[in-house]
């Protein structure tokens, strides 16, 4: 009982070995407790870990006096920062960490049991990431197949076009020859028509009309003269 009472009476600056889940008994120091954390962490001390410079809140049952437990818990350990912590607690027990490191590592060290859950969450995330990668892999596999099918159809269409293309020039060539022949015929036909059209209006201008009328007048005059002579001959008889 005297030992437990003595543990509960730790003061700021006392050197101890602190035990956390997943970690060996670590050289540490009782640090000052912030006033805001006193109510929420009743009967717990803010502990500063040498070597790693992390902080955590631990109860008296997890704290052991350094001098009494040095032979038991002060053996060398391969854990990172442990040997540095033993050196600091002996040679530089008043070392302090920066506020950023202490506040950041406090949350990490205060809840070590949560770390496995975090790892499980990471595992789930990794699983989901792997699942998504598998899905992406399927999508990637399907896309080349679609591209191959599309390329095949394009090749077939291109082949059909190439097969049709030699035929079309021939047909177009025949049509062109026919068009040329028709154009040549049409070009020949309008020429006489134009000549006729041009000749028709020229007839009145040439003066052929009036000479015909004069001939008719002369014939009539000749008939009249012949009749007159006949009358004269008859009278003379």
Curated annotation (Swiss-Prot):
Region (Disordered): 69-237
Effect of residue 202 to A: Does not affect secretion
Cross-link (Glycyl lysine isopeptide (Lys-Gly) (interchain with G-Cter in SUMO2)): 80
The keyword DNA-binding appears for this protein: yes
CDD domains tied to this protein: PWWP_HDGF
Bias kind Acidic residues: ranges: 212-222
Function comment: Acts as a transcriptional repressor. Has mitogenic activity for fibroblasts. Heparin-binding protein.
PANTHER family documented for this protein: HEPATOMA-DERIVED GROWTH FACTOR (PTHR12550:SF41), HEPATOMA-DERIVED GROWTH FACTOR-RELATED (PTHR12550)
Protein name: Hepatoma-derived growth factor
């Amino acid at each position: 009982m005297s030992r437990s009472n003595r543990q509960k009476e730790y003061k700021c600056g006392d050197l101890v070995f602190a035990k956390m889940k997943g970690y060996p008994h670590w050289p540490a120091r009782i640090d000052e407790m912030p006033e805001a954390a006193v109510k929420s962490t009743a009967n717990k001390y803010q502990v500063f870990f040498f070597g790693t410079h992390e902080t955590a809140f631990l109860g008296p049952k997890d704290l052991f006096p350094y001098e009494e437990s040095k032979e038991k818990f002060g053996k060398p350990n391969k854990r990172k920062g442990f040997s540095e912590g033993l050196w600091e607690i002996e040679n530089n027990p008043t070392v302090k960490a920066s506020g950023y490191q202490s506040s950041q590592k406090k949350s990490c060290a205060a809840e070590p049991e949560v770390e496995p859950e975090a790892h499980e969450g990471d595992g789930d995330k990794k699983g989901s990431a792997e699942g998504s990668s598998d899905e992406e892999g399927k999508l990637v596999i399907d896309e080349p197949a679609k591209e191959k099918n599309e390329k095949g159809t394009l090749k077939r269409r291109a082949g059909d076009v190439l097969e049709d293309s030699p035929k079309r020039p021939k047909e177009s060539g025949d049509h062109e020859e026919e068009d040329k022949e028709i154009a040549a015929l049409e070009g020949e036909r309008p020429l006489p028509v134009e000549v006729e059209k041009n000749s028709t209006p020229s007839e009145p201008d040439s003066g052929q009309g009036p000479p015909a009328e004069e001939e008719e007048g002369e014939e009539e005059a000749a008939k009249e003269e012949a009749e007159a002579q006949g009358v004269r001959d008859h009278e003379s008889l």
